[in-house]
Each structure stands twice: as C-alpha cells, then as structure tokens.
C-alpha cells in the first residue's frame, strides 16, 4: 500500500512538472493576443483606471521596511513566482491580479 502511494505521488509530480512549461509557453501567446485586442479597442473607448492595494498588503511591506515596489499584472493565471492579490476586470473579463 505504501509503495502504491509513493508511485502515485511520483507520477503526479512528473505530470505537474510536464504541465507547467506548457502553461509558461502559452502565456506569451495569450499576452500578444490580448495586446492586439487592446490596441484595436483603445481608440474606441479610451478609459483610465486606477489600481489600489488593500491595506494589508502595502502596510505589511511598509512595516517590514521594504523598499521594493510591487510589479503587478492582470492575467488569467499567476506565474509561480507571483502572488494573487485579488481580481481585476479588463473589457468585462475577470482575471487575477498577480504581483511580484
């Protein structure tokens, strides 16, 4: 029984390792398509939007004395080095708000 559990865990890790590079390769293609759509619609509805951080994220960084700024993007899914700080809406579609 223990051997079956270990083999299953190894199989799941191998599948996950194989799936992550596919997602990383697909991300630039999605970004290019998104940029093309955004450029087409930029002339039709030129709108500004504000980004604000929840108090817990920014105040905790200030309390630690960090001088590093957040770099955030609105994406379908966050990279492994990013954290999701909520959601954002672009052209009526909800995405994750991913920050480094």
From Swiss-Prot:
It is found in: Secreted; Cytoplasmic vesicle, Secretory vesicle. GO terms for molecular function: protein homodimerization activity. Keywords: Antibiotic, Antimicrobial, Cytoplasmic vesicle, Defensin, Disulfide bond, Fungicide, Immunity, Innate immunity, Secreted, Signal. One of its GO terms (biological process) is cellular response to lipopolysaccharide. Residues 20-68 form a propeptide. InterPro entries: Alpha-defensin (IPR016327), Alpha-defensin_C (IPR006081), Alpha-defensin_N (IPR002366), Beta/alpha-defensin_C (IPR006080). SMART domains: Defensin_propep, DEFSN. One of its GO terms (cellular component) is Golgi lumen. It holds the Pfam family Defensin_propep. Disulfide bonds join 72-99, 74-88, 78-98. Residues 1-19 form the signal peptide. Proteolytically cleaved by trypsin at Arg-68; the propeptide is stored in the tissue of the small intestine and the mature peptide is found in the luminal fluid; cleavage may occur during or after release into the lumen. The N-terminal propeptide region suppresses self-assembly and renders DEFA6 propeptide unable to agglutinate bacteria and protect human epithelial cells from bacterial invasion. Under reducing conditions, naturally present in the gut owing to the low redox potential or enzymatically generated by the thioredoxin system, the disulfide bridges are opened leading to a conformational change of DEF6, thereby changing its antimicrobial spectrum. The reduced form exhibits inhibitory activity against anaerobic bacteria, in contrast to the minimal antimicrobial activity of the disulfide-linked oxidized form. The formation of higher-order nanonets and bacterial entrapment is independent of the redox state. PANTHER family: ALPHA-DEFENSIN 1, DEFENSIN-6. Belongs to the alpha-defensin family. Homodimer. Self-assembles into higher-order oligomers termed nanonets, fibril-like structures that entrap microbes. Self-assembly into nanonets seems to protect against proteolytic digestion in duodenal fluid. Interacts with Y.enterocolitica invasin and S.typhimurium fliC/flagellim; the interaction creates an anchoring site for progressive DEFA6 self-assembly into nanonets. Host-defense peptide that contributes to intestinal innate immunity and mediates homeostasis at mucosal surfaces by forming higher-order oligomers that capture bacteria and prevent microbial invasion of the epithelium. After binding to bacterial surface proteins, undergoes ordered self-assembly to form fibril-like nanonets that surround and entangle bacteria and thereby prevent bacterial invasion across the epithelial barrier. This is Defensin-6. It comes from Pan troglodytes (Chimpanzee).
């Amino acid at each position: 029984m223990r051997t079956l559990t270990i083999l299953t865990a190894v199989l799941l890790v191998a599948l996950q390792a194989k799936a992550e590079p596919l997602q990383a390769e697909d991300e630039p293609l999605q970004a290019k398509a998104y940029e093309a759509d955004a450029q087409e619609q930029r002339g039709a509805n030129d709108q500004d939007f504000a980004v604000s951080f929840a108090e817990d994220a920014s105040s905790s960084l200030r309390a630690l004395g960090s001088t590093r700024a957040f770099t955030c993007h609105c994406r379908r899914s966050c990279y492994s080095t990013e954290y999701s700080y909520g959601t954002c809406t672009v052209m009526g579609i909800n995405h994750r708000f991913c920050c480094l």
